[in-house]
């Protein structure tokens, strides 16, 4: 029997690892035999350490209104107020340092087919955001997928055009409305 494998995925600006662990949990739950790795990068060494530690307090978990009890049971081992990512999920992640503003980003982290760069670029000034997104786009293999959020719409539009990216419109209105409701 052939084992299905997925090329490494990448999260930039991984913070405490919650997005990367969520992706791993969903992949593992929907494709149990799938072999995959998620490389999670951040510039804050404390956040990298926190993510690699895979342990969260109850408040961190229940601070998110869209998280379900089913997801929590599948993803965490729970002991009192400590929620630890299950070993079978944790084993799919590698945490390390990388800076999206570094022009050698591709040399540091390598090319990728799936990149998540969400909710960190909006902290940057326009020129830095443009440079970061250019560096991120340089990571993309042909036909790669880039998930980006939290960036100025004009910068995103210009760089999407410059890098010949095709915006995904599948269920875009539904996704947008659900995200707005979750933030409310």
Residues of each region from the PLM?
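Conserved beta-strand signature within the Rossmann-like core of class I S-adenosyl-L-methionine
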Residues: 142-151
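Conserved glycine-rich SAM-binding loop
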Residues: 15-17
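Conserved AdoMet
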Residues: 1-10
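A short glycine-rich, Lys/Arg-flanked "PGG" loop and its adjoining helix->strand segment in the class I
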Residues: 130-142
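Extended basic-aromatic, gly/pro-enriched interface segments that bind polyanionic ligands
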Residues: 36-110, 114-116, 120
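Class I S-adenosyl-L-methionine
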Residues: 155-184
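Class I SAM-dependent methyltransferase core
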Residues: 11-13, 40
């Amino acid at each position: 029997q052939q084992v299905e494998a997925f090329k490494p995925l990448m999260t930039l600006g991984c913070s405490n690892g919650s997005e990367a662990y969520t992706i791993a949990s969903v992949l593992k739950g929907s494709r149990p035999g799938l072999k995959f790795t998620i490389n999670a990068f951040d510039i804050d060494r404390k956040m990298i350490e926190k993510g690699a530690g895979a342990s969260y307090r109850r408040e961190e978990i229940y601070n998110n209104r869209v998280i379900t009890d089913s997801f929590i049971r599948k993803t965490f081992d729970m002991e009192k107020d400590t929620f630890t990512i299950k070993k079978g999920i944790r084993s799919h992640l590698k945490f390390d340092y990388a800076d999206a503003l570094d022009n050698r980003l591709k040399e540091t982290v390598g090319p990728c087919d799936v990149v998540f760069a969400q909710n960190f670029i909006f902290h940057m000034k326009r020129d830095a955001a443009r440079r970061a997104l250019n560096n991120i786009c340089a990571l993309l293999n042909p036909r790669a997928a880039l998930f980006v959020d939290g960036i100025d719409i004009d910068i995103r539009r210009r760089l999407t055009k410059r890098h010949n990216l095709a915006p995904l419109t599948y269920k875009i209105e539904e996704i947008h409305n659900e995200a707005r409701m979750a933030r409310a």
